[in-house]
UniProtKB/Swiss-Prot annotation:
SUPFAM superfamilies in UniProt: P-loop containing nucleoside triphosphate hydrolases
Transmembrane segments: 407-427, 436-456, 492-512, 523-543, 550-570, 580-600, 659-679, 1056-1076, 1085-1105, 1121-1143, 1166-1186, 1193-1213, 1226-1246, 1318-1338
Organism classification: Eukaryota, Fungi, Dikarya, Ascomycota, Pezizomycotina
Glycosylation sites per record: N144, N549, N649, N994, N1287
Gene3D superfamilies the UniProt entry points to: P-loop containing nucleotide triphosphate hydrolases
Protein name: ABC multidrug transporter G
Alphabetized UniProt keyword annotations: ATP-binding, Cell membrane, Glycoprotein, Hydrolase, Membrane, Nucleotide-binding, Repeat, Transmembrane, Transmembrane helix, Transport
Sites where the protein binds ATP: G757, C758, S759, G760, A761, G762, K763, T764
Gene expressing this chain: abcG
UniProt GO MF annotations: ABC-type transporter activity; ATP binding; ATP hydrolysis activity
Organism superkingdom: Eukaryota
Length: 1349
């Protein structure tokens, strides 16, 4: 066995020489998918088109073949390199070989693992690992914790020298990280695009380390070197080679821009074109096979790029005289290959899979020896560790993730404390009399409601990290069930802290029963109920593939469970058709248990206004001539048990039954979540182009109009860009860290400058500093354009193509370019000329065929290479004076990379100045650059100057100083390796450069360029911050957003469906409300229920808003395309038509079913107020989102603001008269929901003629000699209500005679108050939208320019 120091990682320490080896055989494999080459993007109307559904039923969807008749065999110890252009089927083949077939409709042919077919191989899922291109990890975990988790789930039973599992994990972690060169990152967070962590190249190596930790005999790698510099990429290929040689691994990989150093490590090569095999055989023969066919491989070119270029007519080089003899199409190449000797020998060299049963037997024994002793004796498991050990590992990791995201935890706990303080002060010191009879159930229902709303954020959270779960499930690290149970376990301590803080504050502030047993009963029930709700919303997320559907269901469930929790409508009052929901609601059981726990054993005194009649002339204490209006009362005493029995049908005996039911629901939701995650399929499949509906594919035309001629002739002003003595410092662990050190350089018009260096040298940092994209740190030195300081218009007049291609997915290519041109070219340029220039750029970048294609997202939209071209186009249509590009060829295949550089060369030859960071360039790509700026570690310069013809100038420089380049080596790779110390004797290249003549010449040239720029008499400074007016920006962004909404049917339809369903549900819940005393309360709750349409809609709206904000902040704000005011203005205005539509639908489905007045003036007023509410909650949600750092933060903040702030103080939960004076005197009047409810409630109550049901009447006797009418005359003169029979002596009294009497208890003293409140609601809508602008302004302040001195 090899030692770790030699760079080989061997985790297989099984005894008796058991090794895991498998031969991978695939014969005549073909793959079919239903996705066509191009599809039409969905719109609001298209998804509702019945013809689509009918077509689907008929099965008329076309099929497409993405792999055809592919065969091969990879034996243990061998490495196969799969090559092909994007779309040729490389990734699809790798998915099939890794036994990941779910994303394909049909896979024909045979795939064998040893002697097993693909069905039998499923039980060895973790022995066939697939590493895809994506580097998605939990960003708040360190590299150490990420690796330890992977290894913890792969600890074999038998370990060398009796080594403990902890020592084993530690040793293997060190070996793997050392082999990949990232051992120094163990304490660094993995991070992502939002959380700072390791670099992109290091994150890629963490992904590679995770697969290596799995130690599977078959390893399938999809573009594993993307984002790595050439030296690291070659080292990784050598690591795979050692793994294959020493541990007999079977390796299959596809790589883009694979240099010759990588290519030479492989044994066999499989070349694909359009899903067909153009070559399969030994690597040594591949180049000569195509050269013999008549193709020429350029000097210094990557052989891998040459093999894939032969099928590209515009790029291949054919030997003179062979033009008519070489094949052109994929079919011709395949036919030629099948007739070759190489094909015959390859097929004859196959070991028959049927004879490889010994491999499967050895694998079965080896896997069995790995299993822990405690593993359950059942059918062979794909997992190394037992379920209990998986749960342990997942639980530890979950706690580590939470520890890394302390902010969310703190927010949860602080929110609970704030909510409890607010709620406790609302229900402060409840009295033991009938005045608290309405408040006490409110105080008990509040924790149920708050934690219901707060748990909704779990649906959002369940979609974060889903790709990680799918990947690690496939790797066999753990069952999703273990992950699910671990989540449930880690909920417990968080909920304990959260609920304890909440309960202690609320319970004692509200002065609920002062009994330890009752407090702890209250506490444990709220904890169980909270856990149950959290798990329920997590289950919703697990069972839904799309977030839109999950948020819709979440919103509906929160409304349903709120209404049927037993608080708004007691069980006996529920309509029979929805009563069953009560039994399925965990919150209903919690509320019953809390009510019984509080009321049983408690006696309340019946006092006025509930003890009737009262006032002067009536008895002041208990009397047979007075009656109590509270159900379950006897005389002037209300027995708690009798009250909850009469009003709610609750019983003391149900407390622990309810607790048991809640725990049962919790377990059920855990099982449901586990089931959803177990059935969750990994996403994948072929990419598909989406076209705008109504568009046609267009071809380039040669005819041009005079306007187009003018547009092409008018190029941007050509400028020279220089920088000198540039230093950049950032704060790091309380000190300053220098990232750039005395860097200088220049870019002239017509010059293409390459910025190169090893990984972590500061290439992107320098580009960000030069382009004014840094918002922190300190910059020193000079950055000049034409010898003058960068002006205010610099960011707008320069183009910057970032590594991440950030675009609005629903826009077409042409729309994205037109948007940029209209907003970034000066306002005085005619619109026709701008559009003509867009056409010119579309032709220049060869985008004509896809100009009407939607940009989309990877997998459903443009390919990576097409997206790069669109990014370039978006910047070019602005006519920039200078163009910056960060890694434009990263992640592309050789031909696509060549295309991008070819386009840049076109631009440069037209006078454009371009500065471009690049790594892993082939010799052909490097040849296209005019100059090179080389950075060594620490941001220090190692070279700046011309490259020369065939890169001879720069190679001579390094040769003179002791590092000559071998004849066949790629110059770019040689230069980068040399400055990293790969020379015979150590050379300090930074010092060599500082002492060189080349540096002095470059500095002299820089001074000359600056002096020439300053002397330009024609220079006119552009002082405009933005190219166009704010009004024009607003109209353009609004138009784009309206199109985006039209093409986002999921978002809009989910909002519409949520409203329609909630309205019908509410309408039939409160069906034809009557005119009894309790029916007045139902009218109030029907309106109160309408308010709860907001949480679901806000939860769905915020990710949409944040997505748009991220695009704005990542690219459009930095390029000064438009102002943040235009962004917020457009966001608010674009939603308005859909909000009015939603209000209309809700009104139509709810108002009439609930039986509200049909008078036009009343119904019209209600409709108007409902529209205002749509505006109100949307603006509040957008205000939270405008400042929130991410979706989860926003989802956690929603219940705090809506629950603590708005619902609590509007006078419904606690009526105005019973509210604490502290809140009543100011916050009640500042709460927009106060006026919202007032505007709605006054109209539907005022004219109601109340007729009490017999059960609602207060009964008492009149004194001897008096009728009820005579006895109550004084009381009725001052107070509301009526007597059923004034002439009787056994009095029956109803508390209200009209709805107006009830309305006055809610501070609606006059009829006009409802219109007054509607006007105030409108003002609150305006102020809420103003808050959105304010929040964005506060956030925008953070992104300031770094100071330059």
């Amino acid at each position: 066995m090899d030692t770790p120091s030699s760079g080989t990682i061997d985790l297989e320490h099984g005894e008796a020489g058991l090794r895991k080896r498998l031969t991978l055989t695939f014969r005549s494999v073909s793959v079919h998918v239903t996705a066509p080459d191009a599809a039409l993007g969905d719109t609001l109307l298209s998804v509702a088109d019945p013809r689509q559904f009918l077509g689907f039923l008929k099965g008329s969807r076309p099929k497409r073949t993405i792999l055809k008749d592919v065969s091969g065999q990879v034996k243990p110890g061998e490495m196969l390199l799969v090559l092909g252009r994007p779309g040729s089927g490389c990734t699809s083949l790798l998915r099939v070989l890794s036994n990941d077939r779910e994303s394909f409709d049909e896979v024909i042919g045979e795939t064998r693992y040893g002697s097993m077919d693909h069905v039998a191989a499923r039980r060895f899922r973790q022995q066939i690992m697939f590493n895809n291109e994506d580097d998605v990890h939990f960003p708040t975990l360190t590299v150490n914790r990420t690796m330890k988790f992977a290894l913890r789930n792969k600890v074999p039973r038998e370990r060398p020298d009796g080594q403990g599992s902890k020592e084993f994990v530690q040793e293997q972690r060190d070996n793997i990280l050392s082999a990949l060169g990232i051992r120094h990152t163990t304490k660094t967070l993995v991070g992502n695009e939002f959380i700072r962590g390791v670099s992109g190249g290091e994150r890629k190596r963490v992904s590679l380390a995770e697969v290596i930790a799995g130690q599977s005999p078959i390893q399938v790698w999809d573009n594993p070197t993307r984002g790595l510099d050439s030296k690291t990429a070659v080292e990784f290929a050598r690591l795979l080679r050692r793994e294959a040689d020493m541990n007999q691994k079977t390796m299959v990989a596809t790589m883009y821009q694979a240099g010759n150093g990588i290519y030479n490590e492989f044994d066999q090569v499989l070349v694909l074109a359009d899903g067909r095999v153009t070559y399969y055989g030994p690597r040594q023969l591949a180049k000569s096979y195509f050269e013999d066919m008549g193709f020429v491989c350029p000097k210094g070119a990557n052989v891998a790029d040459f093999l894939t270029s032969v099928t590209v007519l515009t790029e291949r080089i054919v030997r003179p005289g062979m033009e008519d003899k070489v094949p052109s199409t994929a079919e011709e190449f395949e036919a030629r290959y099948r007739q070759s000797d190489i094909h015959q020998k390859a097929m004859e060299g196959f070991d028959p899979p049927e004879k490889l049963t010994h491999e499967v037997d050895e694998l079965t024994a080896a896997v069995a020896s790995e299993k822990r002793k405690r593993h359950l004796p059942r059918s062979p498991s794909v997992y190394t560790t037992s379920l209990w050990e998986q749960i342990q590992a997942c639980t530890i990791r979950q706690f580590q993730i939470m520890a890394g995201d302390r902010l969310s935890l703190i927010i949860k706990v602080v929110s609970a404390i704030l909510q409890a303080l607010v709620c406790g002060s609302l229900f402060y010191n409840l009295k033991d009399d009938s005045s608290s009879i309405f408040l006490r159930p409110g105080a008990l229902f509040f924790p149920v409601l708050y934690f219901l709303l707060e748990s909704m954020s779990e649906t959002t959270a369940s979609f974060m990290g889903r790709p990680i779960l799918s990947r690690q499930k496939r790797f066999g690290f753990y069952r999703p069930t273990a992950f699910c149970i671990a989540n449930a376990i880690t909920d417990i301590p968080v909920v304990l802290v959260q609920v304890s803080c909440f309960c202690i504050i609320l319970y004692f502030m509200a002065a609920l029963q002062m009994d330890a047993g009752r407090f702890f009963t209250y506490w444990i029930i709220v904890i169980a109920n909270t856990l149950c709700f959290m798990q329920m919303f997590r289950a919703v997320g697990a069972l839904c593939k799309r977030f839109g559907n999950a948020s819709k269901i979440t919103g509906l469930l929160s409304t349903i469970f709120f209404v049927y929790g037993g608080y708004l409508i007691p069980y006996e009052k529920m309509h029979v058709w929805f009563r069953w929901i009560f039994y399925l609601n965990p919150g209903a059981y919690a509320f019953e248990a809390l009510m019984a726990n509080e009321f049983v054993g408690k006696s309340l005194q019946c006092v006025q206004p509930d003890y009737i009649p009262y006032g002067s002339g009536y008895p002041g204490s208990e009397s047979p001539y007075r009656g109590c209006s509270i159900p379950g009362s006897e005389g002037d005493v209300i027995l708690g048990a009798a009250y909850i029995r009469a009003q709610y049908n609750y019983s003391w005996h149900h407390i622990w039954r309810s607790f048991g039911v809640i725990i049962g629901f919790w377990v059920f939701f855990i099982v449901l979540t586990a089931l959803g995650l177990e059935l969750l399929n990994s996403q994948g499949g072929s990419s598909v182009l989406l076209y705008k509906r109504g568009s046609q594919k267009t071809r380039s035309e040669d005819t041009t109009t005079p306007v187009q001629e003018a547009a092409r002739a008018s190029h941007a002003k050509q400028s020279t860009f220089t920088w000198h003595d540039l230093d950049y410092h950032v704060p790091y662990q309380g000190q300053k860290k220098q990232l750039l050190d005395k860097v200088f350089g220049f870019v002239k018009p017509g010059n293409l400058v390459a910025l190169m260096g090893c990984s972590g040298a500061g290439k992107t940092t320098l580009l960000d500093v030069l382009a004014q994209r840094k918002d922190s740190g300190e910059i020193y030195g000079s950055i000049l354009i034409d010898g003058r300081p960068q002006g205010i218009s610099f960011q707008r007049t320069t183009g910057y193509c970032e590594q991440m291609d950030v675009h609005e997915p629903t826009a077409t290519v042409r729309e994205a370019l037109v948007f940029s041109a209209l907003l970034r070219q000066p306002a005085h340029v005619p619109r026709e000329e701008k559009l003509a220039y867009v056409d010119h750029i579309i032709d220049l970048l060869e985008l004509r065929d896809i100009s009407d294609a939607l940009i989309g997202v990877p997998g459903a939209g443009l390919s990576i290479e097409q997206r790069k071209r669109v990014t370039l186009g978006v910047e070019l249509v602005a006519k920039p004076t200078l163009l910056f590009l960060d890694e434009p060829t990263s992640g592309l295949d050789g031909q696509s990379a060549y295309n991008i550089i070819r386009f840049l060369r076109k631009l440069v030859d037209g006078g454009q100045a371009v500065l471009c960071t690049i790594h892993q360039p082939s010799a052909v790509l490097f040849e296209a650059f005019d100059s090179l700026l080389l950075l060594a570690r620490g941001g220090k310069m190692a070279y700046f100057g011309e490259t020369g013809k065939d890169s001879q100038t720069v190679l001579d420089y390094f040769a003179r100083h002791g590092a000559p380049c071998p004849p066949d080596e790629n110059p770019a790779e040689h230069i980068v390796e040399v400055i990293q110390g790969n020379t015979d004797k150590p050379i300090d290249w930074v010092q060599v450069w500082n002492e060189s003549e080349e540096k002095q010449r470059a500095l002299a040239q820089l001074q000359t360029l600056n002096a020439r720029g300053k002397a330009d008499a024609d220079y006119v400074e552009d002082t405009a911050d933005y190219a166009t007016s704010k009004w024009f920006q607003f109209t353009m962004v609004t138009k784009r957003l309206m199109v985006q909404l039209w093409r986002s049917p999921d978002y809009v339809w989910n909002k519409v469906i949520l409203h329609v369903f909630a309205a019908l549900f509410s309408g039939f819940t409160f069906w034809k409300i009557g005119d009894g005393a309790f029916d007045l309360q139902l009218r109030l709750f029907a309106i109160f229920n309408f308010i709860f349409v907001a949480p679901g809609c806000i939860n769905q709206m915020q990710p949409f808003f944040l997505h748009n904000r991220d695009i704005f902040e990542a690219r459009e704000k930095k390029s000064k395309i438009y102002h943040w005011l235009a962004f917020i203005g457009a966001q608010t205005v674009s939603e308005i038509p859909y909000l009015i539509l939603c209000a209309t639908l809700y009104f139509a489905c709810w108002y009439f079913t609930a039986g509200f007045p049909t008078t036009a003036s009343i119904s019209g007023h209600m409709y108007l107020q409902m529209i205002f509410y749509e505006f109100l909650y949307t603006s509040i949600g957008q205000g939270i989102a405008a400042y929130a750092p991410n979706e989860y933060f926003a989802a956690v903040m929603n219940p705090v603001l809506i629950g603590a702030g708005l619902v609590s103080f509007c006078g419904v939960v606690v009526p105005f008269s019973q509210m604490q004076p502290f809140w009543r005197d100011w916050l009640y009047y500042l709460d927009p929901f106060t006026y919202l409810v007032g505007g709605l409630l006054g109209e539907v109550l005022w004219d109601v003629e109340v007729r009490c049901d017999p059960s609602e009447l207060v009964r008492f006797r009149a004194p001897l000699g008096q009728t009820c009418g005579e006895y109550m005359a004084a009381f009725l003169a001052e107070k509301p209500g009526y007597l059923v029979d004034g002439n009787a002596t056994a009095c029956e009294f109803c508390q209200y005679s009209t709805g107006a009497d009830y309305a006055r208890t809610f501070n609606l003293k006059e009829r006009y108050y409802s219109w007054r409140d509607t006007g105030i609601t409108a003002l609150f809508c305006v102020s809420s939208y103003a808050m959105v602008f304010l929040m964005m302004k506060l956030r925008s302040k953070k992104t300031k320019s770094a100071r330059s001195e």
